[in-house]
């Protein structure tokens, strides 16, 4: 893998509650410079699309807890797509999953996927799930025609190799949460991840070493 290909698999992310317009612009500037994607809060998508039209723009819905009403998530997804998002990361309702209401979880993902003509990544919040719950979440997302699985929001724990390995059995995986270095990113790619979400995107790409991908 060369540096450009590597950078294109990084979603440079700014999603904290304190995020200001200047923070978003800084992420977009870095994404444009390094050839990364950018993941920004829904309220900034339209401005971000205008500011950096050549950057692949990712946003979120139902973030970060996943407890919005299903209709609210679907509407939010449609709204951010219309504002310019190229991809959408949606948080599942972890409580419903853990409570055994799998039909509701599947139906919700289906409704969000149907609401937009762009790839939807399903955030399963793996740090909060047992091994069996994680597999159930992956199965539901695959059944609902999601494009990707995403490990976590980063608010409740970090991505792990074990979770990525499991998730990669079902769909392409975006690893997110606690990935702050090139070495950590390589570990996730080696585990089966296809994308990385990280606030340290620029630092990760700065550390690129092609030898890490030589076989």
UniProtKB/Swiss-Prot annotation:
The keyword Repressor does not apply. It catalyses: 2-deoxy-D-ribose 5-phosphate = D-glyceraldehyde 3-phosphate + acetaldehyde. GO terms for cellular component: cytoplasm. The active site is at 89 (proton donor/acceptor), 150 (schiff-base intermediate with acetaldehyde), 174 (proton donor/acceptor). Its EC number is 4.1.2.4. Its main location: cytoplasm. Keywords: Cytoplasm, Lyase, Schiff base. Pfam families: DeoC. GO terms for molecular function: deoxyribose-phosphate aldolase activity. It is found in: Cytoplasm. Pathway: Carbohydrate degradation; 2-deoxy-D-ribose 1-phosphate degradation; D-glyceraldehyde 3-phosphate and acetaldehyde from 2-deoxy-alpha-D-ribose 1-phosphate: step 2/2. SMART domains: DeoC (SM01133). GO terms for biological process: 2-deoxyribose 1-phosphate catabolic process; carbohydrate catabolic process; deoxyribonucleotide catabolic process. It is an enzyme of class 4 (lyase). Catalyzes a reversible aldol reaction between acetaldehyde and D-glyceraldehyde 3-phosphate to generate 2-deoxy-D-ribose 5-phosphate. Belongs to the DeoC/FbaB aldolase family. DeoC type 1 subfamily. This is Deoxyribose-phosphate aldolase. It comes from Natronomonas pharaonis (strain ATCC 35678 / DSM 2160 / CIP 103997 / JCM 8858 / NBRC 14720 / NCIMB 2260 / Gabara) (Halobacterium pharaonis). The lineage of its organism: Archaea, Methanobacteriati, Methanobacteriota, Stenosarchaea group, Halobacteria. The gene is deoC.
